[in-house]
A protein has these predicted regions:
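Basic, alpha-helical interaction scaffolds
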Residues: 25-98, 118, 151-159
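Short amphipathic alpha-helical coiled-coil/interface segments
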Residues: 85, 104-115
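Conserved, non-catalytic sequence blocks in retroelement Pol enzymes and Pol-derived host proteins
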Residues: 45-52, 69-76, 95-103, 355-360, ...
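Long, charge-rich boundary regions
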Residues: 424-470
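Short, conserved catalytic/metal-binding micro-motifs enriched in Asp/Glu and His
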Residues: 34-44, 85-97, 134-144, 367, ...
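Extended C-terminal regions of large enzymes
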Residues: 93, 107, 120-376, 469, ...
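Short Cys/His-based metal-binding microdomains
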Residues: 384-439
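Short, conserved micro-motifs composed of acidic
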Residues: 2-32
Length: 520
């Protein structure tokens, strides 16, 4: 034992003792704080969470100030936020009770300010907290993120073989039968430990988000302490039935999908349940089944309910839990505005999946600004007093708008026609290509298949058009092909470094002729 690096502290009933043993070792006795595995502890465990959050929050604020000085796109700021800043707090959120609400509120406010560089949010927060393929920016919703991290303990309780698991299992024997009870049971049972209470609070919220969508999933739903099945506005609490193997909907159903009679149920379960209790219980179950609109034709249930099976089968980490918790099945407002404005059917799922696959951060951010209708046009700039009028900067004939800037303007249409012509002349795979408004704006069109390089060409063309607008010059095909050739060289070099050169060469094989055109 290295006495110089050893500290001793009294805990429990003797925590205020001043006794010191082995004084010859010159150990530090009763330090005000001590650190184990990155967590600061004191004699009063209730203070641990506050002390750790305050210490790390100060460090996080310094990182925000440092990175705020950099000129980075919002997508780049999100990456920094998740990988370099919030990573300082993740281990605390996993291991300690949830931080106080004011801590979460302050941190969330700073996160949004950082992403938007201290300016007003340009996209609704309920959208930005979603992942990119759902139309968001992946800005972490701190409260939900903490819930998702706490949910990882439910999976650990099931699959871990480490000895720490024996402690909660010994303290709470019902953890061996998680599938037998609804989430409210754990909320009411685990109250004397704030950390474990937070874990099961997260589980309860998760259960409210995950709904069964098949017969077997519905039949595996627990009946007891489940808010979906109530008797007189009170949850069913016949937990003593669990000892007789009765806890989910399937145990009230016969093989043909019909409900058991009272006599059949008593025979099957080995219990003696009175008619009133049985009838009230089955009535609440029938109401729940009716609301679910799922037909019951058998009594074959999954081993565990849908919430637990989702948790157990999730890949490592908390990403899946977080995405489920933040998902509200609502499309971003921009989708409704575009559909109303263009009067066309757009597969927004396809649009956002394509955005997610864009590797170049600047191109991805340009595309997201177009989709979310936040890219600067002269109409907006005129209201801000930046431009003298609202007319298009190219034709000076029509009012500027996103669709006009990238498609409807006569000069821009001429540019797209020239690009379409050279693609058809030089690229065999592009013989049937025809640029449309949806294909240009959103990268997808019904009945038109594209590949990775073609999508990149469209993105590069839009970036070129926007740069020409800022530089107040007309876009020409020759200048664009020069920029495309430069982009090709950069991507080729990156592919060579990353060992992806063969794939890169194959992808570009059909499009090399348009680059040779520019080379002369």
């Amino acid at each position: 034992m290295n006495a110089d690096k050893t500290q001793a502290i009294w805990l429990g009933s003797q925590k205020y003792s001043r006794a010191k043993y082995m004084p010859h070792l010159k150990m530090v006795w009763n330090p005000t704080m001590f650190k184990i595995l990155g967590i600061w502890f004191t004699q009063d465990l209730k203070e641990c969470a506050t002390i750790n959050y305050n210490k790390n929050f100060d460090e996080v604020k310094k990182l925000f100030k440092i990175w705020s000085l950099r000129t980075i796109t919002p997508l780049g700021r999100v990456a920094i936020l998740k990988s370099l800043i919030l990573s300082k707090l993740i281990h605390l959120w996993i291991l300690l009770p949830d931080p106080p609400d004011n801590f979460v509120k302050d941190l969330q406010k700073i996160c949004f300010q950082f992403v938007w560089n201290g300016k007003q949010d340009r996209i609704a927060r309920k959208t930005t907290i979603k992942d990119v393929k759902s139309g968001g920016l992946n800005i972490p919703d701190i409260k939900t993120y903490i819930l998702a991290l706490k949910l990882t303990w439910i999976k650990k309780l099931k699959i871990s073989n480490h000895k720490w698991r024996n402690i909660p299992m010994e303290l709470y024997p019902f953890l061996h039968q998680l599938e037998c009870y609804g989430p409210c049971f754990f909320n009411q049972t685990v109250k004397n430990n704030s950390f474990r209470a937070d874990v099961f609070k997260a589980y309860g919220i998760f259960c409210s988000k995950v709904k069964p969508n098949s017969t077997s999933q519905l039949l595996s739903e627990p009946v007891f302490y489940n808010k979906n099945m109530m008797i007189g506005n009170k949850m069913i609490k016949y937990t003593q039935w669990v000892d007789n193997g009765v806890y989910c909907i399937a145990h009230f159903i016969k093989e043909n999908g019909r409900f058991c009679t009272l006599a059949e149920f008593n025979t099957k379960s080995g219990m003696t349940v009175d008619f009133l209790t049985f009838n009230s219980c089955t009535s609440s179950i029938k109401q729940y089944i009716k609301k679910s609109t799922i037909l019951i034709s058998n009594n074959m249930a999954d081993e565990v309910n849908i919430s637990l099976s989702t948790i157990y089968s999730a890949p490592k980490g908390a990403r899946l839990y977080y995405n489920i918790l933040v998902n509200d099945n609502c499309m971003p407002n921009c989708c409704l505005k575009w559909s109303e404005k263009l009067k066309s059917n757009i597969s927004w799922n396809t649009v956002f999946i394509k955005v997610q696959k864009i590797k170049d951060v600047k191109l991805k951010w340009l595309q997201m600004r177009i989709i979310h209708r936040i890219i600067a046009t002269n109409i907006v700039l005129n209201k801000m007093g930046v431009t003298a009028n609202t007319q298009c900067g190219f034709c000076n004939d029509k009012k500027d708008s996103i669709e006009h800037m990238f498609w409807k303007c006569a000069y821009i249409r001429r540019f797209w026609t020239s690009l379409e012509t050279i693609l058809k002349e030089k690229c065999e795979t592009a013989l049937n290509v025809k640029f449309t408004q949806n294909l240009v704006l959103f990268g997808t069109e019904i009945d038109i298949k594209t590949d990775t390089v073609f999508d990149l060409v469209i993105l590069q063309a839009k970036q070129f058009i926007y740069k020409c607008k800022l530089d107040k010059c007309l876009p020409t095909l020759s200048c664009f092909l020069q920029q495309l050739m430069l982009k090709h060289k950069i991507d080729e070099y990156n592919a060579k470094i990353s060992g992806e050169l063969p794939t890169f060469i194959v992808n570009w094989l059909c499009y090399k002729p348009i680059l040779k055109t520019e080379n002369g």
